[in-house]
UniProtKB/Swiss-Prot annotation:
Keyword Ubl conjugation: no
Family: Belongs to the janus family.
UniProt binding sites for substrate: 37, 104-106
MF-aspect GO terms: protein histidine phosphatase activity
Cleaved signal peptide residues: none
Catalytic machinery residues: 63 (proton acceptor)
Gene, per the UniProt record: janA
Protein name from the UniProt record: Sex-regulated protein janus-A
Entry keyword set: Differentiation, Sexual differentiation
Length: 135
């Protein structure tokens, strides 16, 4: 095997590993209840593959705190992350209710309709509302 073949084989292996890492990233990771900030994150592997995920934590004061925390997780998996926007989530598990609204001062407003679709994959039996009102 020549150097070019070895290099190509190595690249294919790295690409396969990053695709597997991307496939293993959960679509949703949010606090179990309460009102908290969230961010929509585009997670990107070493190639062209990507997926949008929702992250929201009640222990983070700023949207950037959420993104920074998750970006570190993705970097360890060999993935990149971009944040197109954020907002807030109201999560009431007793009522099986989620409300997605508001915006991030730092990242702008996330696509709440996209966020709703992603949340529905984890919470299919919930009522999920969106609103462009509020902060």
């Amino acid at each position: 095997m020549n150097r070019l073949q070895l290099f190509s084989k190595g690249l294919r292996l790295i690409h396969k590993m990053s695709e597997e890492a991307l496939a293993g990233v959960p679509l949703v990771h949010i606090s179990p209840e309460g009102i908290f900030k969230y961010v929509l994150i585009n997670v990107i592997d070493g190639g062209d593959a990507s997926k949008a995920v929702v992250r929201g934590f009640d222990d983070c004061t700023w949207h950037a705190d959420i993104f920074d925390r998750e970006e570190e997780v993705f970097k360890k998996l060999g993935l990149r992350a971009e944040c197109p926007g954020g907002g807030r989530i109201e999560h009431n598990p007793e009522k099986k209710y989620l409300k997605v609204y508001g915006y991030s001062q730092g990242f702008g407003k996330a696509d709440h309709a996209q966020t709703k679709r992603i949340l529905a994959t984890k919470y299919p039996d919930y009522t999920i509302e969106t609103s462009d009102e509020g902060y």
